[in-house]
Amino acid sequence: AVSTGKVDSKFGAAVETGQAMELVKLALTLPHLDLRGLHCHVGSQVFGEDVYQRTLDIMVPFLAQIRDETGVTLSDLNLGGGYGVRYTAEDEAINIPARLAELAAYLKEETERLGLPMPRFLMEPGRSIVADAGLSLYTVGSVKRIPGYKQYAAVDGGMTDNPRYALYQSRYT
């Protein structure tokens, strides 16, 4: 999994440092903006069941903090995407509808506990709905064989077609 939902991430603004609250307060002062909710993205190829629950453990109290400090109750909470896709036999098959139902129930409990209305709960299916829709097909131009060691195939494609392995060591079948 690629983790993007960390304090030191290049993406977004961290709740933990106060930067997210600063941006919320700034957005609320701008007359041309209508702040309706929060969006976060915790990673890519996420298989762990508790990742999104831990995200709710941060975001729901943050919604309450926004209400308490600004008097504004936001209506939307988007946990982004990132559910893992089963590319290899070792990857877990995820029952996304069941996981979403569990998260929605947990969100309802937590918002009720903090006296918040249930926000519109959003997630983005992303690659989980398109990952099996295509494949990469290359033509082998030549093969270099090194007896007793290995062989290499020169193809008419490369890292620019799919940089994820080089960048993140992502595995595919």
Where are the regions that the model predicts?
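Active-site-proximal beta-alpha core segment in soluble small-molecule metabolic enzymes
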Residues: 1-76, 85, 106, 111, ...
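Short, small-residue-rich loop/turn micro-motifs
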Residues: 42, 81-83, 157-159
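Solvent-exposed, flexible loop/coil residues
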Residues: 15-19, 46, 50, 87-91, ...
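General structural signal for secondary-structure boundaries
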Residues: 14-16, 95, 117
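Short glycine/threonine-rich loop-to-helix capping motif typified by GTGT followed
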Residues: 48-55, 86-99, 130-142
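Charged (often Lys/Glu-rich) extended helix/loop segments that serve as interaction or gating elements
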Residues: 102, 111, 116-173
